């Protein structure tokens, strides 16, 4: 059977394929335009960031730039300057995707030379197409975005403004970007640096920074989280719970209601470590130290011993228990056997080093006195007259001493008759056991 409509089917198929190819070509163009637009938008954001950094730089250095510019001669700001001063991050590239380099030209306003105005201009590299310039001029968010089409004039987005590059001492070429920073914009930037913002401004930490001293007029700073400072001077009291200091704390006096903890030494150059209420010094690790609980004695905490390789010296030294020495007992003063002493029980030595003890009020040697065996001993008898007597005044001596091993504990005198020499002295001698 013959097919009379076969040609129509082929024609329909070809038409459908043609439409698909046209749609693909159209879609590819739309996609390409979309990609380009996104790229230009990205470039516009980069220009906006650069311009914002330049605006901040001008605001902070307003007075300096006034001195280095005129109405016709600009002060030029480069990417390197913005990076070195921290207004741009160190990773910001010197050129954009087309190799163009941004610079800001700052001049004085011709009508009011005390005010500054600026133009951000790109130069060098590959020119942008007009379509890209128009798109980017509209997308720039800092300042008034524009572009350069004739190499001499900067034109604003939607042709909203037009300024000759020569007014700013700038040079560029066709297909480049321009951004106008008006006197109002830069005056606002200068004022930004003079204000202390109550809230954080993203990307603008300088707005929360003081650049001079602040006088609170005797008013308070309340609800402060932390105070970080190099030094502090207080004419009144400083009250707090805890304090940590990495350096020195100096003052005329200090009062603490609770504790003071130091990681190193506590020194007094010309004063005392004064405590009250039966307190003193305590070593927490070992539980020892010194304190006073009355007006007479310095006491050892927990009855700890006192150890030194040097001397312990005092008017008197008393031991309620035994007195020990790891070497010898050295007695520096000497006593004389038989001499009086007090109280009984003292221990001494004579000049030869022999030990003496105080017994019954007399220094005696190591042997005890046998008082039950004491006897009177008298001097020898000499029948002679005293001085002025019958024998013509001769003088005679009658010595008396105790036998060896005895000690004299008393004396008595004996005499008879006028002029008769029967006077003598008796000695009361007691033997040692």
From Swiss-Prot:
* UniProt-annotated stretches for the region Variable region: 362-433
Segment forming the signal sequence: none
Keywords attached to this Swiss-Prot or TrEMBL record, sorted alphabetically, are:
Plasmid
Intrachain S-S bonds = none
- The ranges of region (Constant region) come to 1-361
User: Anything else the record notes?
Assistant: This protein is expressed by a shufflon (= clustered inversion region that works as a biological switch). The orfs of this region share a constant N-terminus, while the C-terminus is variable.
Q: What is this protein called?
A: Shufflon protein C'
What phylogenetic lineage does the species belong to? Answer: Bacteria, Pseudomonadati, Pseudomonadota, Gammaproteobacteria, Enterobacterales
């Amino acid at each position: 059977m013959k097919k009379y409509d076969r040609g129509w089917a082929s024609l329909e198929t070809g038409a459908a394929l043609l439409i698909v190819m046209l749609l693909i070509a159209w879609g590819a163009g739309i996609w390409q335009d979309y990609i380009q637009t996104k790229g230009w938008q990205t470039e516009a954001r980069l220009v906006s960031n650069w311009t914002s950094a330049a605006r901040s730089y001008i605001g902070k250095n307003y007075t300096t730039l006034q001195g280095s510019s005129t109405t016709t001669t600009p002060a030029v700001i480069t990417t390197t300057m913005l990076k070195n001063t921290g207004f741009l991050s160190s990773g910001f590239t010197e050129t954009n995707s087309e190799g163009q380099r941004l610079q800001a030209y700052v001049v004085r306003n011709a009508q009011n030379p005390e005010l500054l105005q600026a133009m951000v201009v790109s130069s060098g590299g590959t020119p942008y197409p007009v379509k890209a310039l128009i798109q980017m001029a509209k997308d720039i968010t800092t300042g008034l975005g524009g572009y350069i089409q004739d190499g001499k004039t900067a034109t604003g987005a939607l042709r909203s403004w037009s300024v000759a590059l020569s007014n700013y001492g700038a040079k560029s070429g066709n297909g480049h970007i321009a951004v106008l920073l008006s006197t109002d914009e830069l005056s606002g930037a200068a004022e930004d640096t003079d204000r202390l913002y109550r809230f954080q401004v993203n990307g603008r930490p300088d707005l929360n920074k003081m650049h001079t001293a602040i006088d609170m007029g005797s008013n308070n700073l309340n609800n402060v989280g932390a105070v970080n400072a190099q030094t502090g001077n207080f004419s009144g009291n400083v009250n707090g719970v805890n304090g940590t200091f990495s350096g020195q704390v100096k003052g005329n006096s200090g009062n603490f209601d609770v504790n003071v903890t130091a990681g190193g030494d506590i020194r007094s150059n010309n004063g005392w470590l004064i405590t009250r209420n039966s307190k003193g010094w305590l070593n927490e690790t070992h539980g020892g130290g010194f304190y006073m609980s009355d007006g007479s004695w310095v006491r050892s905490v927990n009855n700890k011993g006192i150890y030194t390789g040097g001397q312990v010296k005092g008017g008197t030294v008393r031991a309620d228990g035994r007195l020990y020495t790891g070497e010898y007992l050295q007695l520096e003063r000497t006593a004389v056997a038989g001499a009086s002493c007090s109280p009984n029980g003292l221990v001494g030595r004579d000049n030869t080093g022999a030990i003496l003890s105080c017994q019954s009020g007399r220094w005696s040697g190591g042997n005890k006195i046998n008082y039950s065996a004491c006897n009177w001993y008298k001097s020898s008898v000499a029948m002679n007259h005293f001085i002025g007597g019958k024998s013509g005044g001769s003088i005679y001596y009658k010595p008396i001493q105790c036998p060896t091993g005895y000690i004299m504990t008393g004396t008595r005198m004996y005499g008879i008759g006028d002029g008769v020499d029967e006077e003598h002295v008796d000695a009361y001698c007691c033997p040692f056991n």
